[in-house]
Amino acid sequence: MTITPVYTTFTPTKTPIKFFMAGLTFLIAHISHADDGRTDNQEPINQEIATLEPIINHAQPELLSHDALTPKIEPILAQTPNPAEDTLIADEALLLDNPDLLNHALNSAVMTNHMAGVHALLPIYQKLPKDHQNGILLGYANALAALDKGNAKKAIDELRRIIAIMPEYNVVRFHLARALFMDKQNEAALDQFNKLHADNLPEEVRQVVGQYRQALKQRDSWTWQVGMNLAKEDNINQTPKNTTQGQWTFDKPIDAITLSYQLGADKKWSLPKGAYVGANAQIYGKHHQNHKKYNDHWGRLGANLGFADAKKDLSIETYGEKRFYGHERYTDTIGIRMSVDYRINPKFQSLNAIDISRLTNHRTPRADSNNTLYSTSLIYYPNATRYYLLGADFYDEKVPQDPSDSYQRRGIRTAWGQEWAGGLSSRAQISINKRHYQGANLTSGGQIRHDKQMQASLSLWHRDIHKWGITPRLTISTNINKSNDIKANYHKNQMFVEFSRIF
């Protein structure tokens, strides 16, 4: 494909914004980063808590973009390129010999937001002698190219330089506001969008600006999550299948109807330069109507300070947790968590966390523990309808007064999420862990305890089945623990329909 230049000069006004803002979609995506799978082993009957996502709660990315509430520009171009071609081929020698032609060609590509043309012509334009270059045009083309490649910071620098020279040009101001939005500089982005909104804009442009302003307000609004499921759960007391082993006799496995619930709220307050502070609260647990001594309820409060831009989100959080087991106070936990969410490129994302905590056991004071978790995940998005996750974890629990309860756990996990044709969606997850304890106990035959654990789940839902913003999900899960400690061998299955909503 060759370039047909449009002979106009680079004199942006308020009207060219119509050309590149003709098409608009409003894309909403949510990545639920659930808990990272930290398991408290200091429980009566060694029961592991599973909330609404009972198996691999390390990272639950939804499909599509990681950023939420991001309007997406789909411009109408002055030319109609061949859909089979991704790039434009330009005669570099011809254009360098004709600086006016090159200026007009790049100007045409910039003013129509024709990114293939901008990417093809910009490297050639940069080879022109300085006295043949238009500095504003060069900066604007650099900014658009940087935005197209996701380099919001470079685009912001270029666009701020231009807007300082030409503050009345709203087409430039719009791209500056959009770059600030991408870089999560929320206060600065809102300031630019407010200036645009106050001007005399065409109605279609005003609607786009309004959607960005609304998206920015929602970034700082309260987010609520409510969910519950009712399930028939087997072996809630997690006892061995064989209740008599040698001189030991164990309770029979108990099957029960389990109500699992979760309620959460969180909020961020944006600060300058992409910084923010946040607060969150959660309650979750399990209720067994006919076996209340196995009821398990948790509450958590957290406050965090962070920094986010288009590529990364860095956060440090302090939190406190309270747990009640069988309606009695069981444990208190205080901790600090550091996390890094980094978008490597549009296809890959990494999630990393370090969590250090102190647990106080009110039922068994000698079981107080110091805990450390290291967690990392890599997510691959081959397209907008699929993702794959691979993760690894290391958890160290030290119980100073009882080495037999101290252990280290190493694990790997994987997940696959898919949107199928016809509206069906699925998520499959599996994790494999090994625990190595520091001491022996009576039921391990005097040997140091070693456990192998496998957890797996499959969730299915239909995207067209929803009511009041709730899409029911069918989940089947299994949890197998094999140990040389005879009381720690168990196998339990669950099947339930989950109802949850985020708003």
Swiss-Prot record:
What keywords are assigned to this protein? Cell outer membrane, Membrane, Signal, TPR repeat, Transmembrane, Transmembrane beta strand
Functional summary from the UniProt entry:
Required for correct export to the cell surface of some cell outer membrane lipoproteins (tested with TpbP) upon heterologous expression in E.coli and probably also in Moraxella.
The protein, known as:
Surface lipoprotein assembly modifier
> What's an example GO cellular component term for this entry?
cell outer membrane
Q: Where in the cell is it found?
A: Cell outer membrane
For this UniProt entry, what is the primary localization, expressed as one broad class? Answer: membrane
Renumbered residue ranges of the record's region C-terminal probable beta barrel: 221-503
Topology term for the membrane: Multi-pass membrane protein
The record, for SUPFAM superfamilies, names: TPR-like
Annotated region (N-terminal domain), positions in chain: 38-220
The text of the family note is: Belongs to the Slam family.
Which species does the entry assign this protein to?
Answer: Moraxella catarrhalis
Domain notes from UniProt: Consists of a soluble N-terminal domain and C-terminal probable beta-barrel in the outer membrane with 14 predicted beta-strands.
Its signal peptide is 1-34
